Every structure is written in structure tokens, then in C-alpha cells.
Amino acid sequence: MQKAVQLDVFGRVQGVGFRWTTKLVADRLGITGTVSNQPDGSVKIIAMGPDAILEQFIGAVKASPTPSGRVDRVVQTPLQDVSACHKFSVVG
């Protein structure tokens, strides 16, 4: 079953390659959506994919896909009404 979530990721997640390594993980797993830096220093991820694969992706995000990053907290919000994406993009 397809699922969509918003992940608000806090920690050392800007200026360390976090968005680009998140994209690599998403592409490898077949996850679609976006990742973007936020003004408060966090990173916002909108991710869509099959339930089990999406859980793998979320686990990778929580573990920080980049060795120079650090994830302190992830706020996960299920999304209901999301436009379909055909790829995973770094925004901004």
C-alpha cells in the first residue's frame, strides 16, 4: 500500500550534505517526494512509497544518511492528500 509522510528533521542537517544523501537513499529505494532546507535550520521531507519501503527510508533518515550530519529529532506526520511525484527532488 502506498503511503505518504512529512518528516521534519532537526539536528545538524544543513550544510553537511544531508539533502543530497537523503536523495541518494530515496532514489535507491524508489521513494518519491522532496527534501528542502527550512529557515529554522531543520530539513523538511515529503516522501511517498510502499509502506515497508517507506519505513526503511524513515529509518535511514533517522540514522542520518550523511556521516557528517546528526539527527536529534524527527517529527513524522502522515499525509493524506498529496500530489503524485515521479521522482525525488532536492528543493532550494
UniProtKB/Swiss-Prot annotation:
EC number annotated for this UniProt entry: 3.6.1.7
Entry annotation: catalytic residues: 19, 37
Catalytically driven reaction(s): an acyl phosphate + H2O = a carboxylate + phosphate + H(+)
Enzyme class: hydrolase
Domain Acylphosphatase-like: 4-92
SUPFAM superfamilies to which the protein is assigned, alphabetical: Acylphosphatase/BLUF domain-like
UniProt entry tagged with the keyword Hydrolase: yes
Protein's UniProt keywords contain Acyltransferase: no
Molecular function in Gene Ontology: acylphosphatase activity
Key words, A-Z: Hydrolase
Signal peptide, first to last residue: none
PROSITE patterns named among the record's database cross-references: ACYLPHOSPHATASE_1, ACYLPHOSPHATASE_3
InterPro entries: Acylphosphatase, Acylphosphatase-like_dom, Acylphosphatase-like_dom_sf, Acylphosphatase_CS
A UniProt-annotated Pfam family: Acylphosphatase
Gene3D superfamilies, sorted: 3.30.70.100
Family: Belongs to the acylphosphatase family.
Name of this chain's protein: Acylphosphatase
Species assigned in the record: Latilactobacillus sakei subsp. sakei (strain 23K)
Lineage, broadest ranks: Bacteria, Bacillati, Bacillota, Bacilli, Lactobacillales
